[in-house]
Amino acid sequence: MQQSKEERVHDVFEKISDKYDVMNSVISFQRHKAWRKETMRIMDVKPGSKALDVCCGTADWTIALANAVGPNGEVKGLDFSENMLAVGKEKVKALGLEQVELMHGNAMELPFEDHTFDYVTIGFGLRNVPDYMHVLKEMTRVVKPGGKVICLETSQPTMIGFRQIYILYFKYIMPLFGKIFAKSYKEYSWLQESASTFPGMKELARMFEDAGLERIQVKPFTFGVAAMHLGVKPESE
């Protein structure tokens, strides 16, 4: 029986959890840290805020949010991979971040009331969900009016020449890195597949609008290999 996308993605992340952080740095040449740092600067997270990190994985962005909201804030991290969460929980415990709660859950059915969070983020996770629009609408539902929904994700470079290099890298070299560094050629082949079919920047910006967000900001990184999309929930619906 053929696996659904959700089942396949779950299997991938359960298998690569112990090498995920190392591989993130290898395949992005450490750039993912700078992308997240700049995204956080644009977000301008206020101390004492409530934030939700969807598809939080090993909790790197969750931890950055916790540092930004401070001890009087609150951060939830949600992921459907227990193994990824286990890695994240060890990090959170080591840092003593009592304002963080990591939980097992599904991005398609966020277990929160409407208008709960000031910020809702998803980092390198939207491309792996079964329905992009459904998850964006769920994120919009649980953010407060005036709150921000933010996606940091791989994208499709538009610069001629560089786009071809990017495609070759993702299709052939990244899975090879997965085999060398994580013994996971098949799993990293899936990650390049999910990245190659993900909407480009303009299309994702339209999806943010269709999800009910306004004042959309788009910030490309490293010639467009990744991009931040930020939208604000209207004050009155």
Swiss-Prot record:
Annotated GO molecular function terms are: demethylmenaquinone methyltransferase activity
- What pathway or pathways are given for this protein in its record? Quinol/quinone metabolism; menaquinone biosynthesis; menaquinol from 1,4-dihydroxy-2-naphthoate: step 2/2
What the entry lists under InterPro entries is as follows: MenG_heptapren, SAM-dependent_MTases_sf, UbiE/COQ5_MeTrFase, UbiE/COQ5_MeTrFase_CS
Q: Which UniProt keywords apply?
A: Menaquinone biosynthesis, Methyltransferase, S-adenosyl-L-methionine, Transferase
User: Biological process GO annotation list?
Assistant: menaquinone biosynthetic process; methylation
Q: What is its EC number?
A: 2.1.1.163
According to its UniProt record, which reaction does this protein catalyse? a 2-demethylmenaquinol + S-adenosyl-L-methionine = a menaquinol + S-adenosyl-L-homocysteine + H(+)
Q: Which residues bind S-adenosyl-L-methionine?
A: T58, D79, N106, A107
- Function summary: Methyltransferase required for the conversion of demethylmenaquinol (DMKH2) to menaquinol (MKH2).
Q: Which family does it belong to?
A: Belongs to the class I-like SAM-binding methyltransferase superfamily. MenG/UbiE family.
The protein, known as: Demethylmenaquinone methyltransferase
From which organism does this entry originate? Bacillus cytotoxicus (strain DSM 22905 / CIP 110041 / 391-98 / NVH 391-98)
